[in-house]
Amino acid sequence: PWGLRVEAESPLTVLTVVRGDVWIVPDDGRPLCLRPGDVALTHGSGHYTVADDPATRPDILILPGQRCYSRDGQAPEAPLSQGVRTWGNDPDGTSVMLVGAYEAMSEVSDRLLRALPPVLSLAADEWDCALVPVLCQEVVKDDPGQTAVLDRLLDLVLVAFLRAWFARPDAGAPGWYTAQADPIVGRALRLMQTNPAHPWTLESLAREASVSRASFA
């Protein structure tokens, strides 16, 4: 049995299961079972437990800054490092997962995350993402520039997850997100995002979108 008590309060954490079953048990929510290929996203300051079973008592506490302690607040009794960016009590264990945490988010990202529940997940057949195997291969490497490689891969996994999530009919995607798919409004939004310093007006946006001002308004 194994369990992690997560009180890191990272703005955003992405967890993908590689092997075995993993349970996420939020303090204020229902337990969530993840199987190989499933992915979960947590955000905000909520605390939760990650374990092999909802009833397993956590033996490791993770605090802000990814600081790890045993259940009694002491340093873990046994070294938990299993190699490059690999952490746990058994490299051949029955449960293996990839975890990436964002420690800072932009205002735009925060606006997007406010549209999401605190904990959400997608099953493997809901988001066929070819990036996860690549991330599995890259995370154990220690080559020059590897941090930049992993950061970009994690960004891509996050974008793929959010696209798949908001494509669900029950996702409740915010209006500004769905507007991106509109051929006229979406083009205008992209223009303003690309050049926010430009003094855009209804007339100039309508002209760039190849529609009349009345149609655009």
Which residue ranges define each predicted feature?
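Tryptophan-centered motif/residue detector
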Residues: 1-2, 23, 87, 165, ...
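N-terminal regulatory/effector-sensing and dimerization cores
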Residues: 2-113, 117
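Basic/polar phosphate-binding segments, predominantly the helix-turn-helix DNA-binding elements
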Residues: 156, 160-166, 181-182, 187-217
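Aromatic- and histidine-enriched alpha-helix N-cap/loop-to-helix transition segments
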Residues: 9-12, 152, 156-157, 183
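Amphipathic alpha-helical segments enriched in hydrophobic/aromatic residues interleaved with Lys/Arg
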Residues: 72-156, 160-165, 169, 173, ...
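Generic structural signal for alpha-helix termini and adjacent loop/cap motifs
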Residues: 20, 53, 138-141, 195
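Short, Lys/Arg-enriched N-terminal segment that forms or immediately precedes the first helix
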Residues: 2, 170-176, 217
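Short helix-capping and inter-helix turn/linker motifs at the boundaries of alpha-helical repeat units
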Residues: 126, 178-183
